[in-house]
Curated annotation (Swiss-Prot):
GO terms for molecular function: chromatin DNA binding; DNA binding; DNA-binding transcription activator activity, RNA polymerase II-specific; DNA-binding transcription factor activity; DNA-binding transcription factor activity, RNA polymerase II-specific; DNA-binding transcription factor binding; identical protein binding; protein homodimerization activity. Residues 1-91 are annotated as: Transcription activation. The gene is GRHL1. It comes from Homo sapiens (Human). Belongs to the grh/CP2 family. Grainyhead subfamily. This is Grainyhead-like protein 1 homolog. It comes from the Eukaryota. Methylation at Arg-9 and Lys-116 may be involved in regulating transcriptional activation. Residues 380-389, 427-430 are annotated as: Interaction with DNA.
Amino acid sequence: MTQEYDNKRPVLVLQNEALYPQRRSYTSEDEAWKSFLENPLTAATKAMMSINGDEDSAAALGLLYDYYKVPRERRSSTAKPEVEHPEPDHSKRNSIPIVTEQPLISAGENRVQVLKNVPFNIVLPHGNQLGIDKRGHLTAPDTTVTVSIATMPTHSIKTETQPHGFAVGIPPAVYHPEPTERVVVFDRNLNTDQFSSGAQAPNAQRRTPDSTFSETFKEGVQEVFFPSDLSLRMPGMNSEDYVFDSVSGNNFEYTLEASKSLRQKPGDSTMTYLNKGQFYPITLKEVSSSEGIHHPISKVRSVIMVVFAEDKSREDQLRHWKYWHSRQHTAKQRCIDIADYKESFNTISNIEEIAYNAISFTWDINDEAKVFISVNCLSTDFSSQKGVKGLPLNIQVDTYSYNNRSNKPVHRAYCQIKVFCDKGAERKIRDEERKQSKRKVSDVKVPLLPSHKRMDITVFKPFIDLDTQPVLFIPDVHFANLQRGTHVLPIASEELEGEGSVLKRGPYGTEDDFAVPPSTKLARIEEPKRVLLYVRKESEEVFDALMLKTPSLKGLMEAISDKYDVPHDKIGKIFKKCKKGILVNMDDNIVKHYSNEDTFQLQIEEAGGSYKLTLTEI
C-alpha cells in the first residue's frame, strides 16, 4: 500500500577514492561489524543520538548490532524470502535486482544500507514519495532511479531533486562479496543546508558511534552512513582535502620583458613596444598549485611564432608573408630569430626553426625556460601603400605535451606587439610620457600608467581557442634550410601547400620522433643569382637591358648573340674596359659578382672570321 508522507530523508555518499586519506579495509561485512561490536552501542550513545533528534538512526543502529551478532552460517541458512514484488516487470525494466527481506531487518522501523565502492551523487527526494508501511512488509516502488557518477569534481556539495521516489531495498539474504550496486533507504526529511560546508553549527561535533570512523580509510572499505552523521562528517572535510585532477594546459605562464605602452584601454590587450632586430627575453614556466613537486614526465614542446593579430584567412596571411619576403635583401631573412645566448641554451633544447615565422624548442616544466627572441618585420611591411596603418602583430606561444600525440596544444597564449625601427620603441615611450605629463588629471579619459609605476614585464594572455591551427610561412625553395642542429620537424609533403604551411603536426611521444631519416631530407636548393646589364652601342643613346639566363661568361655571350645578331660560335674574346682605362678579360667571376646593373658601351670588331667584343664601363 502506498501513501504520501512528509518525512523524507536525504542520504549523501562520498565515493571511496585513493586520493582521500586511507582507512583500513575489511574483506567482508562481518569483519567490518566485528570492530563495531568491540565498542557496543551504549545507552550514552543512544541518548546523545536521541538528544540530537535522530531516534530513527539509533533504532536502526541497534537493529544492525543485533543482526551481525548472529553468525553468518545461521543467517544464511535461516533466511527466507518474505517479500513479493507486485510489479516485477517494472523492477526488471529499471534494472533493479529483486531482493528478499530478512526477518531481522523487516522487524525494524528504519532500514539502513551498507554501501560498497559504487560512487553516488547526493540524492534529495522531492515531491510525491511512496509510503512505507513500517509495520508490514516493503512494497515495490512505483518509480526506481539509480544515480551514479565517476568523480566528485568540486568541493561544494550540490543536491539533485527527482520528482519520484527512489528504490527501497534491503540486503539480500545470501552474501555477495562484490555487489555491483546497492539501494539507499530514506524516509525522513532533512534540511539541504546541512550538506554545505559552512552550515555546521558552532557547537556541532563529529560523533563516532563506533571505531570505524576514527580508523584509516582505504579503498574497498564498507561503511554505513547515517543521515545525522553525514551532516557532521561533511563540514570536517576542507577544500584542501579534495585532490583535483588538474586540466592540462591551464597552468603555464609566459612573460615578455619589454617596454609596455602607457596608454592601455580597458578591455584591450597590453601593447608592447619592440625594436626591429633587437632580442627580448621570453620566460616560460609552469604555474602549479603544488609547488616543489617534480613531475616524472616533465618535457613539453613550445612553439613561439609571429602571427597576425586580426582574423584573416589563410590565403591573406600567406599573401602578406610572401610580399614581406619578396622585399627583403636576402631570401634567408626570417621573421623571427632566436639568440644563441648561454643563458637561453641552458634551459632549452632541440631548437628547430620550423618556419620563417616560428621557432620550436623543448623545455622542462620543473624549471623556468628563457629564450631571447627578435622580430624582424614591421607592421607596415605588408603593404606597398605609404602612410597606411600597419597590420597588428602578435607573439603567440603554443605548448604541446609529449604525453599527447594530438596536434592540439595544451596551452596557448599571445602578446600584442608593435615593432619600430631605429630605437623607435624608446622614442614612443618618451613621447607618451611627455603627453602624459602635459595632460591634466581632469582631462584624462583613458587610464594612464604613471612612469614610476610602469612595469617592463608583459604577461601573455591565454587563448581559449586551441583548435585553430596557426599559419606558418615556409617558402618551398628554402624549406631545407629551416633546420638548426640535427633535427627537423617532420612535415608530410601533402602538408606543404604553395608558399606556406599550416602547422598540422604537434609534439610527439619521444624526441626521436622529431628526427628525419637521411633519405627523406630535402636537398639544398640555391636560387640562381640573376645578372642584369645595361648596354648600348657607341652610335646609340638608349641602353638595352641584357638579362643573363646564367651569371657566367657563357650567359653573357648568349645574351649578346640574341640581342645583336652576332653568331654565338664566332664570338672570340670579350673584354671589359674599366673607368680607369684598364682592359681585362671577362670571366665568370667578373660577370657574377662585379657586373650586375652596370652600364656599358658595346664595341663589336670583326677580324679573321671572329668577333671581338669590348664592354667599356660608363
